[in-house]
Amino acid sequence: MAAARQTPRKLKIGAGSVVCQEAEIKGEVIIGSKTVVHPKARIIAEAGPIIIGDNNLIEEQVTIINPLQVEENEEVPPERIVMHIGCNNVFEVGSLCEAVKIGDNNILEAKSRVGRQTVLSHGCVIGARCEVTSQETIPENTVIYGQSCNRRVQAERPVPQSLQLDFLTKILPNYHHMKKSSRS
């Protein structure tokens, strides 16, 4: 019961954002304006705050987690790590993101996974069921696709999902309870 009372103080929701009450949000989370968070999405900030930019789409069963990683012999709690997610990103159904830094205009397709050591720059697409867990920065406009997680570079960044965001902003409140915006 105490954890439920602490959540509103640690959660900041930007103007025009739609965050469904059924979404699980724990820890210090800042959600930018015009972002949509579907029901059953999970945003868990254990190791430090998660800062999510504007115009992001976070679909059902997505897990965005800033996990606390404690070594076996470590008695001192590790330093706080801030997770930054840029603007105009799409997290499709069932994707998992642990990356500490994600740029703008990225797409994590259904059931994709981006690990803790990976940095997504801008305009990247992680294909359905593809996993990227290596310690690297994915170059701009990279597409990772297929069963073997092949890579190629696309000519342009993915188009922002502004029409879909507008539609969901109008429709979701008709069918779900919303968390209140902190800034009006």
UniProtKB/Swiss-Prot annotation:
The UniProt entry, under Gene3D superfamilies, shows:
Hexapeptide repeat proteins
Q: Where in the cell is it found?
A: Cytoplasm, Cytoskeleton
Q: Which GO terms describe its molecular function?
A: dynein complex binding
Family under the similarity heading: Belongs to the dynactin subunits 5/6 family. Dynactin subunit 6 subfamily.
Keywords of the record, alphabetical order, are: Cytoplasm, Cytoskeleton
Q: Subunit comment for this entry?
A: Subunit of dynactin, a multiprotein complex part of a tripartite complex with dynein and a adapter, such as BICDL1, BICD2 or HOOK3. The dynactin complex is built around ACTR1A/ACTB filament and consists of an actin-related filament composed of a shoulder domain, a pointed end and a barbed end.
GO CC annotation terms, alphabetical = cytoplasm; dynactin complex
Q: Which InterPro entries match?
A: DCTN6, Trimer_LpxA-like_sf
Identify the gene encoding this protein. Answer: dctn6
* SUPFAM superfamilies in the record: Trimeric LpxA-like enzymes
Q: What is this protein called?
A: Dynactin subunit 6
Instruction: Give the organism, scientific name.
Output: Nematostella vectensis (Starlet sea anemone)
Q: Does the keyword Translocase apply?
A: no
Q: What is the lineage of its organism?
A: Eukaryota, Metazoa, Cnidaria, Anthozoa, Hexacorallia
This chain's function reads: Part of the dynactin complex that activates the molecular motor dynein for ultra-processive transport along microtubules.
The UniProt entry's GO biological process terms, in alphabetical order, are: mitotic spindle organization
